[in-house]
Design a protein with these regions (language model features):
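Periplasmic/cell-envelope proteins involved in peptidoglycan metabolism and beta-lactam response
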Residues: 1-273, 364-374, 524-574
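Beta-lactam-recognizing serine transpeptidase/beta-lactamase-like catalytic domain environment
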Residues: 25-26, 97-99, 249, 253-294, ...
């Protein structure tokens, strides 16, 4: 009897019913008041489920949108690799490594994993006494994940690891290191914490340096680390001797514009990722804009010779001691003869003599020369930090003052490139730190004949008794050049001393600019001046910038493999 009853009440199971037992039960008892309320509750469950699912969907869409918009801002906090950009190596002309990405770590703290806070803080204080323990404790008390220290070096990472604290999380990332510290600070620039270039070469070539297809091919610069180190050391030494507030140097190949060295002082260690805001740290060679003084006299003389208005031997007569131009009185720093040759005017560096040559040229031709040399345009160079030459109006006396380098402010980079063109046969070149097949722009600013004459005069600036650059007459290197002593633009209490040299002057290969900001008389320095030992008593460029340029050329000459026949015949051949 019992078996038959069970068989009678049995119902067939429908596989398509999603809630068979529940629905069947409700169907049977729908009219019951208690179960009627249960039926209403089911609708509420569906509604709550729908709202919860909608919120989850909205949140997921928002996270996806934000991560796509700026993926580098989203990192995993549970010891998973941070997504930082890989970058190519940077090497110098001799394949010396100067920048590379390495695997490094950030140290973070997960407060929820700390078992004994006091003991944890004691460990941190003992091993890292410079970290702000009070601030760390406040952050721990908030209970949120935070960074203890970013960009750990290997020693710091090992010390933290040895603490054995689970709350310490190590996030791996790609760190950019610069193998020579501050040596290339104004050239290489820096990257941010996500390895995106923010200054210098790192910013200018950012896209190329992040190119995945080129990761195994280093970016090769024209710089020479040995020469960069030598020039930087000598310039640092000079700043101490002459108590200068700043300095700069630039060495360039006169024939193709390749920059072998670029130094700006003071510099800074680019591995420290410090925010540099003090203007004393600007790149003085490419960003600084200065009145460079008498180095402009070479431009004036070259243009006059090119226009066949004068020759090096042309005598300029009736040179006055002073000239009044508009409201300004122009004079020389010392008394010169009333009649001098064009060559002597440049060798002795006469303002008034140069002014009289410029008047022969005329304003329009001088304008055309400046335009052809791009001296008033932003320079073309593979760095982000480029200065803008100051614009001016060609009013009365402008031609006269520009002729000797006052009233016109440009970058040292532009001045050096123009000297390269004047001495390489007249060919305009584009300065570069990247080797390229074609660097000349096929323009000439002067003829080969004019260029040869200028080289001859620049050599005499160094060798002649009345020349202003005798201290650069380095045995065997045939140095020529021109000095410039001027006041800093906008502050007549500060001075800038510059020397641009070319060597060997008979067939120039290199041009070297050396500049010192606010140098003082080095009264304790003993100069070897024309075979005599004398103490320093003067403060013009000929007594500081020229002196240090000579020291630099003497040391880098062998590195550049310049054939020093005098030295060879005297010390090697015998």
């Amino acid at each position: 009897m019992m078996k038959k009853k069970q068989k009678k009440n049995k119902k067939n199971f429908n596989i398509n019913q999603t809630s068979f037992y529940f629905e069947d039960y409700l169907e049977t008892n729908k009219k019951n008041k208690i179960f009627k309320n249960s039926y209403i509750s089911q609708d509420r469950v569906y509604l709550l489920f729908f709202l919860f699912f909608s919120l989850i969907l909205i949140f997921a869409i928002k996270i996806t949108f934000l991560s796509l918009k700026n993926p580098k801002n989203y990192i995993y906090k549970n010891n998973i690799t941070q997504f930082t950009a890989l970058r190519r190596d940077i090497i110098d002309r001799n394949d010396v490594l100067i920048s590379r990405n390495i695997k490094s770590y950030h140290a973070a703290i997960n407060p929820s994993l700390i078992k004994d806070k006091d003991n944890f803080l004691i460990k941190i204080r003992i091993n890292f006494p410079n970290l702000p323990i009070e601030l760390i404790e406040k952050k721990i008390n908030k209970g949120k994940y935070f960074y203890l220290k970013k960009r750990l070096n290997q020693n710091e990472k090992e010390k933290l690891w040895a603490l054995g604290e689970k709350a310490l999380i190590f996030e791996p990332f790609q760190s950019r290191i610069y193998t020579h510290g501050n040596l290339y600070s104004h050239i290489l620039g820096q990257v941010d914490y996500d390895n995106y270039g923010i200054s210098g070469v790192e910013k200018y070539f950012d896209k190329s340096l992040k190119n995945k297809e080129l990761l195994n091919k280093p970016l090769k610069l024209t710089l020479d680390t040995n020469i960069q180190y030598t020039i930087s050391s000598e310039l640092n030494h000079a700043m101490k001797i002459f108590r200068a507030t700043g300095g700069g140097a630039l060495l360039m190949d006169v024939n193709n514009g390749e920059v072998l060295s670029l130094v700006s002082l003071p510099n800074f260690d680019i591995n420290k990722r410090e925010k540099i805001v003090d203007k004393k740290y600007i790149n003085k060679i490419t960003k600084g804009v200065y009145e460079l003084g008498s180095i402009f006299k070479t431009f004036t003389v070259a243009l006059a010779i090119e226009k066949n208005l004068v020759s090096p031997d042309t005598i300029i007569e009736n040179i006055p001691k002073k000239i009044k131009c508009s409201r300004h009185e122009i004079s020389d720093i010392k008394e010169f003869p009333k009649a001098m040759s064009v060559q002597d005017i440049l060798v002795r560096s006469s303002n008034i003599g140069t002014l009289m040559i410029a008047q022969k040229i005329g304003e329009q031709d001088y304008k055309d020369f400046i335009k052809k040399t791009n001296l008033l345009s932003i320079p073309e160079f593979e760095l982000e930090e480029l200065g803008t030459p100051l614009s001016f109006k060609w009013n009365k006396c402008k031609l006269e003052t520009i002729s000797y380098g006052h009233g016109i402010a440009i970058t040292p980079l532009q001045a050096t490139a123009t000297y390269a063109a004047l001495t390489n046969g007249g060919n305009v070149i584009k300065p570069t730190i990247i080797r390229k097949e074609e660097l000349k722009d096929n323009k000439k600013i002067v003829s080969s004949e004019t260029s040869q004459k200028i080289n001859s005069i620049l050599r005499k600036v160094v060798t002649e008794k009345e020349g202003t650059a005798s201290l650069a007459n380095i045995y065997g290197y045939d140095v020529g050049g021109k000095t410039g002593t001027s006041q800093n633009y906008g502050n007549d209490k500060e001075n800038l001393n510059t020397f641009i040299s070319v060597f060997p002057s008979q067939d120039p290969k290199y041009v070297l600019l050396v500049m010192l900001e606010n140098p003082q008389v080095a009264s304790n320095l003993i100069y070897n001046y024309r075979g005599m030992k004398i103490k320093g008593t003067r403060n013009e460029a000929g007594w500081n910038s020229v002196y240090i340029a000579g020291k630099i050329i003497e040391k880098i000459g062998p590195i550049l493999a310049i054939k020093n026949e005098e030295f060879y015949n005297k010390h090697v051949a015998k």
